[in-house]
Amino acid sequence: FFMKIKIGQPGTQQEMLEKDMARLSAIHAALDGCRTPYSVSGKLPYYFDANGRYEKKETLLRLLDHAKKIGAFEQIALIEEPFDEENEIDVHDIPVRLAADESAHTDKDAVKRIEMGYRAIALKAIAKTLSMTMKIARVAHDKGVPCFCADLTVNPILVEWNKCVAARLGSFPGLEGLGLLETNGHQNYKNWATMRSYHPHPDA
């Protein structure tokens, strides 16, 4: 029910923007009328992942203007890593929630991103170690910044590890009392069903 949409398509910045706008228009039209009981609005939240492809704030704002034009803006729950981590842009004036992911390697990095205006943190308890993840979650909590879990296409056992972290996070803004966990292993592992069978309680 939480629609992850990859943006930042190949090409020049102008070509990328045009492709991203067209992709958003197509997806938004295809999902027209879809509803979920898990969001406050009842509509499907959109989660954009840019992987640092946007070079300038102005380009991202043009995408958001397009989202407003087609009626998709209110459904954008977050945009993850729109800019390269070395491109230290103040984002306080961007009117949607931006999330730090790859750029938040440590708790100190997370604090820096929060000070730059980022309003969410992606936790990766496997990639960034559980101990560092707890430190990042702590500083984010202290500053009132919500977190969610992303799993890097891990196996079923490690999905459970992430669930344990996600279950202890506060509700993500816009959701009805729910934490947020991204998992996509079932879409990428050929033998996912077999891998699940190794779990002592695969249907839990």
Residue ranges and their predicted role:
Residues 1:
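Glycine-rich active-site/cofactor-binding loop and its immediate structural neighborhood
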Residues 153-204:
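Flexible C-terminal active-site loop/helix
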Residues 5-153, 158-159:
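Catalytic core of soluble alpha/beta enzymes
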